[in-house]
Amino acid sequence: MSPRNRFLALAALALTGSLALTGCEGLDDLPDPARSDDAAPAPGGSALEAAEGLTVKGRAPKTGYERGEFGSAWIDTDRNGCGTRDDILADQLDDVSRDDDGCKVLSGVLDPDPYTGTRITFERGRSKVDIDHLVALSDAWQKGAQKWSDGKRRAFANDPLNLVAADSSTNRSKGEGDTATWLPPNKAYRCEYVAGQVSVKKKYELWVTRAEQDAMREVLAGCPEQKLPSGGNPTEAPTR
């Protein structure tokens, strides 16, 4: 640090201390609405190493699971005025057109669809594009989410880190499958797909079965440079 910069830094520290002594709040004392420990992104890094580090346990019973346990579908957890489904469509489709409200996505193009590698034209109401949870809600329920708060389950169901626009028929063939039981037909997307699942499970501290971890290893061993995606929403949704 140069002498001039060192002087400026010391002056700034002195000013902050002076403000505190006079009863004023320093800048560091002001609340930062954009900052939250829960909002910290899942750290990037090797997806394969992260998969190795996931907790391994058996699948718990599905008893008590229903979609409503994860809140109403597609709520506005980030408080931007739009539901999560439309946020994801707007982010992942090209040539998007919206309703007059500025939120509802009426049409767009998914090119390529990650699950099939094909080009799909989206028109609202035609049901050719679904928003898929990379880690299915029922899978999460059986691997830790039963114990979560309602707010954490709502956050999980609406976290962009766990959501992808995809061909509807292919998505529905997946059901509640994990890596051991289902992979997208588009082999070029499998590394990214599995890395996404690993990142979500790491972020939300969900466990995996032994077969699931083995399948993750097998896919990611073919792309050892694959990194974890990061980001998404806080792990607790706002109180509605």
How should these model regions be labeled?
Residues 79-83:
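Acidic, glycine-anchored loop motifs typical of Ca2+
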Residues 74-78:
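Acidic, divalent-cation-chelating loop motifs in proteins
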Residues 12-17:
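Hydrophobic helical h-region of N-terminal Sec-dependent signal peptides
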Residues 20-23:
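C-terminal motif of bacterial Sec signal peptides marking the signal peptidase cleavage site
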Residues 114-240:
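Domain-level detector of nuclease and nuclease-like folds
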Residues 25-28:
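Bacterial signal peptide processing site
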Residues 32-69:
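N-terminal low-complexity, Pro/Thr/Ser-rich intrinsically disordered segments
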Residues 1-11:
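Bacterial N-terminal signal peptides that target proteins for export
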